[in-house]
Amino acid sequence: MNPRAVEIAKKLSPEQRAGQRILVGVVPSDSPEYITNLIDTQCLAGIFLLGHWTNRSKLEAMLSAVNHVSPQGIKPIVATDHEGGEIQNIRVPGVDHLPSQEALARMSPAKVQAVVTTGARQLAKLGVHMVFSPVAGVIDPRLGVRNKPIAKHHRGFGTDPHLCGQYSAAVVAGHRKAGIISTTKHFPGIGRITEDTDFKSAGITDDKTTRHDRYLESFRMAFDAGSEAVMIASAYYSKIDPGTLGLFSSKIMTDMLRGDFGYQGLIVSDDLGSSVSVFSIDGGHRASKFVSAGGDLAITADPLLAGPMIRALTSTATSASGKKRLVDAASHVINVKLAHSLTK
């Protein structure tokens, strides 16, 4: 951790520190003025692109506006999904179409790194800083395409933990070469569930993965390659923390990631805004539950939840331990921004 990150975080007000914990979704129909006003007035950590951006001029206008706002001297992160195949938000001229991870796994890891580096440089030139990729989760061979979140949509590298790790590490290396922040996902893996947590609240329990499971090797290899961020799954893991969604589990984020793995990077939530798996929880408290369990950066597809999330996060900072957690999480976000010249 850069000591400067802690120094900056401590100088912010509680509300500003809370804002630096939230990334909001942006769709092509949003106006740059609306989004930059949200970032500026709420000191938000940044944005992530949603939907299909096919008009380069419209995309450039949005990213130019966002990259010129700087609340408290801290620039926003611009993130996007760019796994390949079906999952890539940016589809404009000048950005190569990336094959799905399933297709990438038919190449050599060295070739994958080269392909990813080229695409990541194109994204960086547009003003993108962070990519929600790679998907490091290992697919249960007994499920195959019945695994809807990964296998059905060709999002995985396969069923072998070591090979998945090799390819995940290659993607991370490609991002790093281009100066892009990798977000390895969805820890501790969603290859052993049948339903997609974005659309279902049933069929999202992994009853096999354990705390020291061999399927976790792929994540460790991605971390060793330098993945600066990790996204937490919104599934249940009955052999790790029964009854608690992954992104609200201190056993997964604090005990496993920070403890077992010694991971010091940025811990990012899966979507807390529109995912069906979290609908039963008040919108604002989704962020505070995530952060209290050890998370750093909460993402919401619904930008209108930013205000309630800031209020909920601020309310948890009344105790000494709550304030320390808020400062610590904001410091992790700012630490990544310092490394990518998004603040000084």
What is the meaning of each model-derived region?
Residues 27-40, 111-122, 212-219, 281-289:
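Short, acidic/polar
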Residues 321-328, 342-344:
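Flexible, glycine/charged-enriched surface loops at secondary-structure junctions
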Residues 13, 57-67, 162-325, 335:
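Second-shell residues forming the walls of enzyme active-site clefts
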Residues 20-31, 99-114, 200-213, 273-281:
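Active-site mouth loops of central-metabolism enzymes
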Residues 67-96, 116-142, 164-189:
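Glycine-rich, aromatic-flanked loop segments that form ligand/cofactor-binding clefts
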Residues 91-104, 144-156, 198-199:
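Surface-exposed, active-site-proximal loop segments in enzymatic domains
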Residues 19-26, 45-49, 76-82, 130-134, ...:
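Hydrophobic faces of well-ordered beta-strands that scaffold small-molecule active sites
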Residues 1-94:
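N-terminal hydrophobic targeting/anchoring segments and the immediately downstream early-domain regions
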